[in-house]
Amino acid sequence: MAMKIRLARGGSKKRPFYRIVASDSRMPRDGRFIEKLGTYNPLLPKDSEDRVKMDMERVQHWLDQGAQPTDRISRFLEAAGHTPKKERANMKKAQPGKKAVERAEEKAAKASAAAEAPAEAPAAEAAAEE
């Protein structure tokens, strides 16, 4: 039986509330689960203690039994200091693409050329007056 520690959605429309559960991976997301391990309320502020509550002893028990945490649960465990932080695969996601870099370079070149042109004009007028 492939076990997962994952989120099961509850709450009403536009007001999500999640249970952290240990369940068989073949069961539906909000369906049958084996044990409730905690709760997650995304509507609370990030620094609130009630945002994520987990029974760490039971979570460790299920991890020892071979249950695989989902990505979000593994992030919760990392934030709690229960597991070491892993490298993420999308390190370049925040960097701009090639065309955006080219446009930024062109814009910078035009701005520097425009800044140099007015600076040269008064210098040329001063030289012409002498």
Swiss-Prot record:
GO biological process, one term: translation
Keyword Repeat: no
Compositional bias per record (Basic and acidic residues), positions renumbered to this chain: 99-109
Highest taxon, organism lineage: Bacteria
Residue numbers spanned by region Disordered: 80-130
Record's keyword terms, sorted: Ribonucleoprotein, Ribosomal protein
CC terms in the record's Gene Ontology section: cytoplasm; small ribosomal subunit
UniProt biased composition (Low complexity): 110-130
The UniProt record lists the keyword Secreted: no
GO MF assignments: structural constituent of ribosome
Alphabetized Gene3D superfamilies for the sequence: 3.30.1320.10
Family: Belongs to the bacterial ribosomal protein bS16 family.
Name of the protein: Small ribosomal subunit protein bS16
Organism of derivation: Jannaschia sp. (strain CCS1)
Lineage: Bacteria, Pseudomonadati, Pseudomonadota, Alphaproteobacteria, Rhodobacterales
